[in-house]
């Protein structure tokens, strides 16, 4: 039985941030959707602007800093973060991006997985607002998860609820059903330690919210980052609260600042 309160909250998320609830307006022609089941190739990564700084390497050959981040972005990375999900957009106005899961050891940062992804329809923003159809640039904690389907084996707190519904169609006419089968809340304008469906907005409702990692539906989102269902399960199983995981997200040029 769907609990009305959580179903209403999920519907609100669709309108304000988590990117799946609106039919595309005419006049938009976003790029072709990513193939969520195909690993990212070096050619795809090379399509990003060549602005990424060269990372310092440890004696063991691992980067000492997260690759692609400039000093401004690196300064936002907490000292205790030992797991990072880096989302690098192909351009400031592009809905296509690449997700790399990193783990920090004594030798440096190691890339454990690379996945194709979608972000918001209009790309990225340094000052995200509700309904601007851009994903927020920044560094955010990853503390809470949930979904319509049962916990696949994550170590994060997991809220299994029928409130994670995603009706309707996306910007390219694709069905949104199943988009919220698995989600990880990105701690932009939300209260950490609560269900992803929680409606607390510390920056105010106008700044949007409900920014999640969720299952890809084959097109751009309202503000979230989406990857294939298989990769969402991989992400959920990999994230470890003891490693203080974070999301680092933005277009390549912005992250390199």
Predicted segments with their positions:
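Cell wall/extracellular polymer interaction/catalysis modules
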Residues: 21-214, 237, 252-257
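C-terminal motif of bacterial Sec signal peptides marking the signal peptidase cleavage site
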Residues: 16-17
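N-terminal export and membrane-targeting signals
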Residues: 1-11
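Extracellularly exposed regions in secreted/surface proteins, prominently low-complexity, repeat-rich
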Residues: 211-212, 218-257
